[in-house]
Amino acid sequence: MPLQIIDYSEQLATIRRVGADAVLLSLVGEDAVAFNRAFGVQGLGRSALRLSCAIEENELLAIGAQNTERLYVASSYFAALATDANIAFKERYHNHFGDRAPTLNSLGQSTNEGVHFLASLFERGLFEPSQWKHERREPIAYRSAREAVYGGDGINLAPTYMAVAEGHVFRVIGRL
């Protein structure tokens, strides 16, 4: 469907008419928020689950707790991730930025992780991007709240997690 639709009634009517058991969402930002709000208002969460790979914590807040019934998300990071690395990351984040810090999400976490990965490359003397793609050494260790690892030889071992929305937060239900 096109982006920036204000009225999702036609799409929601189709979902209801065909008796969909599940809806795969490929919307981001305001489009994801608007669609999920309308989905929730129409009570479609009682009959169809939703799966997205692009909803993060700030969008979840904007969707509204009352509109998250049976909303599942697959992502490489959730603030609710209960790994030792993420607990330490969140502690450092809140110690630095305080109680009013912006909500942690995959965008902020991946930026932080990217900086640490780049620092690891520089520590190995790899200062030019042309050197990076030819790097065939052993795995590169770097700080990762989601426990990602660069395995060497162009292999990135980044995990993917599944979570379910519970009101304004995600509950991680497993690693895929």
Give a label for each model feature.
Residues 7-10, 34, 55, 84, ...:
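Extracytoplasmic/secreted proteins, especially bacterial periplasmic and envelope-associated proteins
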Residues 23, 35, 71, 93, ...:
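Residue-level signal for nonpolar/aromatic packing positions in well-ordered secondary structure
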